[in-house]
């Protein structure tokens, strides 16, 4: 035996709902992108009224005044309004007409701000939880460059000073190399020494000739 649920006991997220209600109104047909026809109907029992969404041929068969048994339905919030749906394996069966005690009020499909706040809070929780991870990951890299800059300013010459001190010493090395290159240039100036010897020899020969 399946237990029947009253309209007043329907809450968002409930599944496997079994109800008996009478159809009060049938709404306009709207078509989805897939070509399905969707119709929203207003139904009621003795505890209140609610909207139910019916698809395709079933929606065309439902008429106001029909007494219908819903099996394996579920409830969800659509645009801030509590709505009934036929779930997978669910069924709508006509069991009578007109003769049923019902109450049109309260209407449980009226827009409820609580449903909107719940949906907004759920979205905000999801949005807040997702960005926290990237923020945590971006924090450590920001600290590491600061530590590197401190090491560059410190006495340790391995990371930072490679670019700093060496360029200052670089200009000192080239002049030293130039000095070493100038030495071989001075060495060829040495040979004039031996060239002076033939001059002295010439003087001696002249002296000897005078003698």
UniProtKB/Swiss-Prot annotation:
Residues 114-128, 177-187 have a biased composition (Polar residues). It comes from the Eukaryota. Residues 129-149 have a biased composition (Low complexity). Residues 22-92 bind DNA. The keyword Ion transport does not apply. GO terms for biological process: DNA damage response; DNA repair; double-strand break repair via homologous recombination; establishment of protein localization to telomere; mitotic G2/M transition checkpoint; positive regulation of telomere capping; response to ionizing radiation. Signal peptide: none annotated. Component of the SOSS complex, composed of SOSS-B (SOSS-B1/NABP2 or SOSS-B2/NABP1), SOSS-A/INTS3 and SOSS-C/INIP. SOSS complexes containing SOSS-B1/NABP2 are more abundant than complexes containing SOSS-B2/NABP1. Directly interacts with ATM, SOSS-A/INTS3 and RAD51. Interacts with INTS7. Belongs to the SOSS-B family. SOSS-B1 subfamily. This is SOSS complex subunit B1. The gene is Nabp2.
């Amino acid at each position: 035996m399946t237990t029947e649920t009253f309209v007043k006991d329907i809450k968002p997220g409930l599944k496997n709902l079994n109800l008996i209600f009478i159809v009060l109104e049938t709404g306009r047909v709207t078509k989805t992108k897939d070509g399905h026809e969707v119709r929203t109907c207003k139904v009621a029992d003795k505890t209140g009224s609610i909207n139910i969404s019916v698809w395709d041929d079933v929606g065309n068969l439902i008429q106001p005044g029909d007494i219908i048994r819903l099996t394996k339905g579920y409830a969800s919030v659509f645009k801030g309004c509590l709505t009934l749906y036929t779930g997978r394996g669910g069924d709508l069966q006509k069991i009578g007409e007109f003769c049923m005690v019902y109450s049109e009020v309260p209407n449980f499909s009226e827009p409820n701000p609580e449903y909107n706040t719940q949906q907004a809070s759920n979205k905000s929780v999801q949005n807040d939880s997702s960005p926290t991870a990237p923020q945590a990951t971006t924090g450590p890299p920001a600290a590491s460059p600061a530590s590197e800059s401190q090491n560059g300013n410190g006495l340790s010459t391995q990371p930072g000073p490679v670019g700093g001190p060496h360029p200052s010493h670089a200009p000192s090395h080239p002049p030293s190399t130039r000095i070493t290159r100038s030495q071989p240039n001075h060495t060829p100036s040495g040979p004039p020494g031996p060239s002076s010897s033939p001059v002295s020899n010439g003087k001696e020969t002249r002296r000897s000739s005078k003698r």
